[in-house]
Amino acid sequence: MVPNKHLLLIILSFSTACGQTTPTTAVEKNKTQAIYQEYFKYRVCSASTTGELFRFDLDRTCPSTEDKVHKEGILLVYKKNIVPYIFKVRRYKKITTSVRIFNGWTREGVAITNKWELSRAVPKYEIDIMDKTYQCHNCMQIEVNGMLNSYYDRDGNNKTVDLKPVDGLTGAITRYISQPKVFADPGWLWGTYRTRTTVNCEIVDMFARSADPYTYFVTALGDTVEVSPFCDVDNSCPNATDVLSVQIDLNHTVVDYGNRATSQQHKKRIFAHTLDYSVSWEAVNKSASVCSMVFWKSFQRAIQTEHDLTYHFIANEITAGFSTVKEPLANFTSDYNCLMTHINTTLEDKIARVNNTHTPNGTAEYYQTEGGMILVWQPLIAIELEEAMLEATTSPVTPSAPTSSSRSKRAIRSIRDVSAGSENNVFLSQIQYAYDKLRQSINNVLEELAITWCREQVRQTMVWYEIAKINPTSVMTAIYGKPVSRKALGDVISVTECINVDQSSVSIHKSLKTENNDICYSRPPVTFKFVNSSQLFKGQLGARNEILLSESLVENCHQNAETFFTAKNETYHFKNYVHVETLPVNNISTLDTFLALNLTFIENIDFKAVELYSSGERKLANVFDLETMFREYNYYAQSISGLRKDFDNSQRNNRDRIIQDFSEILADLGSIGKVIVNVASGAFSLFGGIVTGILNFIKNPLGGMFTFLLIGAVIILVILLVRRTNNMSQAPIRMIYPDVEKSKSTVTPMEPETIKQILLGMHNMQQEAYKKKEEQRAARPSIFRQAAETFLRKRSGYKQISTEDKIV
């Protein structure tokens, strides 16, 4: 047993460096350091069955290249462009907001009980004003059910107002609005409702995206416009319909808000009008703005192998091959004109790099793979081989042939000279034989090189496949170059990304003991938090800083047990399942398992996962930018002020609040209280329904007109009754006898005393008659008594006696 202080610890190192054999550049050092730090982050890796599925291609065979024609050259690969066309758009719309406010008896009783919001497109003549002066009219007209309704901001008059910028959350979206506050002032009369109107003009400058085949586009706020951004070029702009109309302005002016006086820009612009908004964008040339293909990779030295029906292209930099038909693409320069500038520039740069050893052998050729990728193939030929061919086609017996002539001229002259004698024919045959042997030797070398590359890749795939059976996680991590999680699903592997936890929240426990004295943890327990989370989770420290979401790694406790666990740049030393000390990782020697080959002229072929599209391209491939959409919408919705009360508060100011308060008072009465509450609630609901029905009847146009007529008739009737009452009080005799004044000339009035005697006698006579009627009414039995007596008499067989005499 070696003492602890002399214990030699060796940690396995999977370094891929080659020592002093291959110098490492600064870029490679930075890249290696980035990967190293990524490996030493605390992370949680799950083995979800919903991850990406992969399998190893074990059926790949290396094609037989015997007696095949091999050519070397420069290969450019272009892939389908999945990134949408991104361009600037400007959206215009007017928004009318109508709110209904209830003015309660107190200041706290003011509440908004309802809200309506409508948006409409802006007409073209007003868009011109908005783009030139950033002004608009604060009114709008909306046709609803065949009726044209006019809305004015603040319930006022039509005015020209200024648009001002609004702070946004993202720099890609800029808003200009005319009214930032919602008009929600209550009426002056208590207990009444009032409807307030707000009209807001809005301009939004943002980006839009359109994917191939460019038949529609989506704005950054989520608006979808079913118009091609290049509809002016391909004449696909739709005609005016009920849903969408398009206008093209050949000389439209759009000014910058900060430089409104000097930033005049007159450009061709397209306008699309929908029901809710209008949107415009600058008309551009489609061929100069978008391209269906995009550059992927270039290979300085590639090999083209000719088979019976296809061409095979391979290169040392990639573990994949390309297969195409022999027929090159027709009309490539016209169909893919957008690629020609990049192709010519790239080929010139590649040719310049090998200008000392190779020269172009013909023009560039264009092929298309079965997967839709475009291959640009520029054949190359070694300078020595070209010189040998030129010498072979040049006659040595023709002194007049200039050395600076072209190859075609020398070939023609050599043919003429060869026909002069058999000596030249023998000489030319010798040169041709030497050239054929040289070409065959070069082809054999290229053939062996191609087969070697292919076999090496097949063997590496088989090795990875067998290792994956032992530890798939390590295999996929090595292939991806970053920590991933895997799960074997039969013959395929499910790969998911690991989730980095909050690095500062990870706490490694100092004890490996459990509540059971005989059971101990085989890996240190840890507690941690996820990013943007406050909840603590428990787990165990796994290999290479992975956190396992379980505490099931246990073992029987052993006496004098000693373990070492590495986390980030530190090693934790446990003795008897208790933490003793923390050592730096650098203090522990490494066991380097990499065997360096000190041959600088041999290139290393690494197994790499071919990534056709980067993560950035896949992210941009979606025309919906959901992150920007939701962030901007939430920020804009929260920044609008003016709504001082919510709808929950409005429920406390209506008639139901009385029932709620009444039920709270009678809650302690038990079932009796429930009965009282139900009766009161039914009564209030009944009267509430009656009142609601009356109000709805009044709201109806016919009912409202009838109500106004009824109110007018009642007012007229009241006026007539008041006048009649006044006349009765002023001249009662004249009201009873209208013709009394006409008899003044023929009738002599009586003395006042006599008239008073007559009136007093009439009053006494009326009172005596009234008293007799009251006495008779009092002596008469009540209705209930009469009904009871009638029932009893009929029951005993009695009948009512007739009060009239019968005439016989």
UniProtKB/Swiss-Prot annotation:
Family per record: Belongs to the herpesviridae glycoprotein B family.
Subunit structure as annotated in this protein's UniProt entry: Homotrimer; disulfide-linked. Binds to heparan sulfate proteoglycans. Interacts with gH/gL heterodimer.
Region called Hydrophobic membrane proximal region, residue ranges: 647-699, 658-698
Pfam family name, one: Glycoprot_B_PH1
Gene3D superfamilies (UniProt xref): 1.20.5.1890, 2.30.29.100, 2.30.30.1230, 6.10.250.3280
GO biological processes: symbiont entry into host cell; virion attachment to host cell
Stretches the record annotates as Involved in fusion and/or binding to host membrane: 101-107, 187-195
Residue spans, topological domain Virion surface: 20-701
Positions annotated with a glycan in the UniProt record: 30, 158, 239, 251, 285, 331, 344, 355, 361, 532, 569, 587, 598
Signal peptide: 1-19
Membrane-related topology note: Single-pass type I membrane protein
Compartment(s): Virion membrane; Host cell membrane; Host endosome membrane; Host Golgi apparatus membrane
Post-translational modification as stated in the protein's UniProt record: A proteolytic cleavage by host furin generates two subunits that remain linked by disulfide bonds.
Annotated positions for site Cleavage: 410-411
Name of the protein in question: Envelope glycoprotein B
